[in-house]
Every structure is written in structure tokens, then in C-alpha cells.
Amino acid sequence: MTTNPKPNKALKVKKEAGENAPVLSDDELVSMSVRELNQHLRGLTKEEVTRLKQRRRTLKNRGYAASCRIKRVTQKEELERQRVELQQEVEKLARENSSMRLELDALRSKYEALQTFARTVARGPVAPSKVATTSVITIVKSTELSSTSVPFSAAS
């Protein structure tokens, strides 16, 4: 049997747990500064110091995790609100777009009718065989309204 030339000093200087350590609540342990913590840890055994530091680290991590959860939920709610808002705006713009397309189609139809009318007026008298079968515009001249312009109406 061999003996260890260096005796374990931790066994010689053994203190009772809690002998010098005042009891710290979780809130106190988390909220105190490192300097304050080190002052409280003076005179404690390595095991007690390790246990208190580990407990402090665990409590702080719990706080950070709770904070992250709250932040994540808040961000998710904000993104959901923005998504709904943008979806409503897209639907509104789609309705406006549809309305404008209908208006554009109506204006295009009127424009084409006016162009057709302008071409027939520019050609002069049209022979009945050359009249387009898809659209017919009738111009009526009245002797009473010879000095005023003739009202025009085209089917749209």
C-alpha cells in the first residue's frame, strides 16, 4: 500500500454546510452583482461556491429563456397583425384593379367606336355594300339644326 504524499486539504478544512453562508433567496441571488456574490461566497467551500454559482446560472438562464419566449410571442403577434393588414390591402388593391380594368375596357370600347366613326366620316359617303356588319353608326342631318353640331351617341 502506498500513501498519498499530499494529503487532501479539503478534508482537513471541512466546514459544515451553511456555517458561514447566509441563506439567499432566488431573487437575491439573481439580482446581486458579481462583486456582491463574490463577497457572499468568501469563506465557503468549493462545493458550496460551485453549487451557488450553478444555481445562479440556472436561474439567470430561466429568466433569459422566459424573456425570449415573451419576445418571440410578441414578435409573432406583431407579424400576424402585419400579415392580416397586408392581406386586406392586397384584397383592396385587387378590387381597385378590377374596377379600373372594367373602366378601361369601357373606355377602350368607346374609343374604338369613335375611331370607327371617324374613319367612316373621313372616307366620305359609304356605299351600302361597304358598311361593316359588326357596327353601324347612323348620322341624321336635320335642316333645322344645320348651324349646330349633331349630337353623337355610340353603343358601348
Swiss-Prot record:
Phosphoserine: residues carrying this PTM: S25
Protein family per UniProt: Belongs to the bZIP family. Maf subfamily.
Name this polypeptide is given: Transcription factor MafK
Covalent cross-link (Glycyl lysine isopeptide (Lys-Gly) (interchain with G-Cter in SUMO2)), residues: K130
Record domain bZIP: where: 51-114
SUPFAM superfamilies, A to Z: A DNA-binding domain in eukaryotic transcription factors, Leucine zipper domain
InterPro entries noted in UniProt: bZIP, bZIP_Maf, bZIP_sf, TF_DNA-bd_sf, Transcription_factor_Maf_fam
Superkingdom, taxonomy of origin: Eukaryota
Keywords: DNA-binding, Isopeptide bond, Nucleus, Phosphoprotein, Repressor, Transcription, Transcription regulation, Ubl conjugation
Subcellular localization(s) per the UniProt record: Nucleus
Entry-linked Pfam families: bZIP_Maf
Subcellular location, principal: nucleus
Complex formation: Homodimer or heterodimer. It can form high affinity heterodimers with members of the CNC-bZIP family such as NFE2, NFE2L1/NRF1, NFE2L2/NRF2 and NFE2L3/NRF3.
Entry GO MF terms: DNA-binding transcription factor activity; DNA-binding transcription factor activity, RNA polymerase II-specific; DNA-binding transcription repressor activity, RNA polymerase II-specific; RNA polymerase II cis-regulatory region sequence-specific DNA binding; sequence-specific DNA binding; transcription cis-regulatory region binding
Region (Leucine-zipper): 79-93
Region described as Basic motif: spans on this chain: 51-76
Recorded GO CC terms: chromatin; nucleoplasm; nucleus; RNA polymerase II transcription regulator complex
GO BP annotations listed: negative regulation of transcription by RNA polymerase II; regulation of transcription by RNA polymerase II
Disulfide bonds: none
Keyword NADP: no
Main function: Since they lack a putative transactivation domain, the small Mafs behave as transcriptional repressors when they dimerize among themselves. However, they act as transcriptional activators by dimerizing with other (usually larger) basic-zipper proteins, such as NFE2, NFE2L1/NRF1, NFE2L2/NRF2 and NFE2L3/NRF3, and recruiting them to specific DNA-binding sites. Small Maf proteins heterodimerize with Fos and may act as competitive repressors of the NF-E2 transcription factor.
Repressor keyword on record: yes
